[in-house]
């Protein structure tokens, strides 16, 4: 049974309250580095990405440098990451598109971001919200799992349905805090196996809601 909007909001706000200082866990210094890091994080832990990116960004600090590199040169720096050959191909193509279509700058709109090779809706939403402060809600595996486990959405909900549901429940200024808190919550408490959510009864203290 999917929770009412008021009860779902209560659960999400309690998760935010558990991790009020949650921050992005990917290391980056500018919009290009953020875009690259998020692209690399697909099916890979943020910790693994953070080990690979310092040398990658030193070798290819700009879209121009990345576009000029061969795929094999890029692969050398990310070979310990999942799907690294595909990611190297996407990074080179994406860098070329940034130069050709956006004067070497990372665009700010979802439509423009999703026009880039290797950039889907989740990556676009992270870049918009974290990089540019534009309200957007990114759905990763933690977010989707938590929303289903806590009946915020039905078990069959797609990532887009999860995104729209959370955006309907929370005001825009809470979308990014919710996304980041849910990642922490998913890692520390709401595990894929043996979740420990029952130790946090405040999540379910609905009172008269």
Language-model segments: which ranges?
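Catalytic cores of DNA base-excision repair glycosylases
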Residues: 2-209
């Amino acid at each position: 049974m999917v929770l009412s909007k008021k009860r779902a909001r209560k659960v999400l706000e309690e998760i935010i309250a558990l991790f009020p200082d949650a921050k992005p866990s990917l290391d980056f210094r500018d919009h290009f580095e953020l875009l690259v890091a998020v692209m690399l994080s697909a099916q890979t832990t943020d910790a693994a990405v953070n080990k690979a990116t310092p040398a990658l960004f030193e070798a290819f600090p700009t879209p121009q440098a990345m576009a000029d590199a061969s795929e094999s040169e890029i692969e050398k720096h990310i070979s310990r990451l999942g799907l690294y050959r595909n990611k190297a191909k996407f990074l080179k193509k994406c860098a070329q598109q940034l130069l050709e279509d956006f004067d070497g700058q990372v665009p700010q709109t979802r439509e423009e971001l999703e026009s880039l090779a290797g950039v889907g809706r989740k990556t676009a939403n992270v870049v918009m919200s974290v990089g540019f402060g534009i309200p957007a809600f990114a759905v990763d595996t933690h977010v989707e799992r938590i929303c289903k486990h806590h009946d915020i959405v039905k078990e069959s909900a797609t990532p887009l349905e999860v995104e729209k549901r959370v955006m309907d429940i929370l005001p825009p200024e809470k979308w990014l805090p919710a996304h980041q808190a849910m990642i922490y919550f998913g890692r520390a408490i709401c595990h894929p196996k043996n979740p420990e959510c029952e130790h946090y009864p405040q999540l379910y203290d609905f009172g008269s809601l």
